[in-house]
């Protein structure tokens, strides 16, 4: 997909977040001073990441039930490997966990990002 077309798709995704993605985004965008910055529906290479923290080189993916199917597992592994080659770690969180406690899920994402930032220094 060309960069311009991918950016257009990412913009459309930003306007149509899933419910768990929206709940996380509302918490991540209202971060405290000193917390890492996250981008939503961030295009990188051939992919669009649910959330991306550039300081931590951390991709956060919110996985629904479809991510347990064999074909999707293989696609996710291929994507994770491609990102790892670029130095980007993928952290996957189940959508049901976000629905159960979005605050805890968002805090967990921030902690993972902070740990990764500290380890990169």
What is the predicted role of each segment?
Residues 1-121:
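Nucleic-acid endo/exonuclease domains
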């Amino acid at each position: 997909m060309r960069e311009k077309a991918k950016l257009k798709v990412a913009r459309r995704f930003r306007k149509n977040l899933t419910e768990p993605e929206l709940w996380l985004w509302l918490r991540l965008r209202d971060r405290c001073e000193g917390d890492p910055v996250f981008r939503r529906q961030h295009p990188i290479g051939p992919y669009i990441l649910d959330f991306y923290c550039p300081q931590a080189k951390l991709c956060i993916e919110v996985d629904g039930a479809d991510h347990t199917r064999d074909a999707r597992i293989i696609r996710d592994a291929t994507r994770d490997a491609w990102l790892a080659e670029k130095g980007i770690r993928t952290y996957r969180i189940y959508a049901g966990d976000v629905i159960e406690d979005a605050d805890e899920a968002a805090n967990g994402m921030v902690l993972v990002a902070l740990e990764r930032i500290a380890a990169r220094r």
